[in-house]
Amino acid sequence: GTLLVAWWQREAPFVAWQMLVIDAQAYALTLLVNDLTKWASGRARPWVRNGDCATNRDSPSCGGGGRNLSFYSGHAAVTATSAGLLCAHHTQLSLYQNDYLDTGTCVLAVLGTAVTGAMRIASDNHWASDVLVGHLMGYASGYLLPTLLYYKEFRAAPHEHRDSLEYAALPLVGDGVLGVTLMGLF
């Protein structure tokens, strides 16, 4: 929908193309990180521990390759990515040129992902923590990443001259190394 609004209503096909590339990048990141995390963690789904599988591992409902792919919820991550992208595009570009409609679109998208998460928990497919982490990861790749990378309001403007030292502590992970490194700008 937002691509069509940018393309036809706003008559900005290049903006629509840029949004499509941003969306593809966000979804690719979401799916890649989600799949890697699911396979690395191997967390059992609630129905494996609480349902028929808890007492009878040979039950037909215990079959399938997704038994230990609970963490974190891909449905929550993808819907949160969608909501994040909608919010980023609508709040940064004012696609409808109406603050109420653009904000309303964002709110409805966030409500939609919340309902999806609640349904994943209620259906015994995910633990609440699976859904919470899925939402956080989805919003990070759908809203935070595009906003920081592509929308100038969140990017720090370059400084001609720094009056003070700015520094940050960053994690340091390497082959046999785990620690913290200090990075500074002056």
Indicate residue ranges for each PLM-predicted region.
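Long, hydrophobic/aromatic-enriched structural stretches that serve as scaffold segments
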Residues: 1-8
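Transmembrane helix-loop-helix
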Residues: 9-13
